[in-house]
A protein has these predicted regions:
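N-terminal targeting signals for export/organelle localization
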Residues: 1-16, 136, 140
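A short beta-strand-turn-helix
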Residues: 13-35
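Short pre-active-site segment immediately N-terminal to redox-active cysteine/selenocysteine motifs
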Residues: 33-35, 39-43, 107
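Hydrophobic beta-strand anchors of alpha/beta hydrolase catalytic cores
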Residues: 36-37, 65, 111
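Conserved redox-active cysteine motifs that mediate thiol-disulfide chemistry
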Residues: 39-55
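Short alpha-helical
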Residues: 45, 72-76, 98, 129-130
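Conserved segment of the thioredoxin-like fold in thiol-based oxidoreductases
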Residues: 59-60, 64-96, 108
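Thiol/disulfide oxidoreductase modules built on the thioredoxin-like
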Residues: 82-87, 94-139
Length: 140
């Protein structure tokens, strides 16, 4: 289900998945760009179901798909991405689940459509074709 929002994104610092570099929210989310932040885990069955939609959306130059890897291990997360592909420009590593809570997430998967440091919409559960079509229309 879609939740209308328009709240500012949380201000945070976190480690990037591959580089282990600590970054803050202002470094990740640039103004005047669309982002889809997808909270996912390798152990999450619905995350597998939505993954092909994320791979498709990642091909669109008008949006940056970012991942927040939730309560996972790097080994399992890397296997997941090697098997299904990596749609994410950047991945935030959240092995203890704290960053997801800061976003107001209750589980996985959840996705946030972001523009100018504001959450335009939050999508709870696996993405579907209808929501992805809506995103593509919005970011044209």
């Amino acid at each position: 289900p879609v939740v209308k929002n328009n709240n500012k994104i949380p201000i945070f610092s976190a480690k990037l998945f591959y580089s282990n570099k600590t970054v803050n929210s202002f470094e990740i989310f640039e103004p005047n760009k669309y982002y889809l932040l997808n909270i996912w885990s390798s152990w999450c069955v619905p995350c597998r179901q939505e993954h092909s939609l994320l791979m498709d959306l990642a091909k669109n130059k008008n949006i940056n798909v970012l991942g927040l890897n939730y309560k996972d291990t790097k080994i399992n997360a890397k296997k997941f991405l090697e098997e299904l592909g990596n749609p994410y420009k950047k991945i935030i590593f959240d092995n203890n689940g704290v960053k997801a809570i800061e976003w107001g997430a209750f589980g996985v998967p959840e996705s946030f459509l972001i523009y100018n440091n504001k959450v335009l919409e939050k999508y709870v559960g696996p993405l579907n074709q209808d929501f992805v079509k809506k995103i593509k229309l919005l970011i044209k």
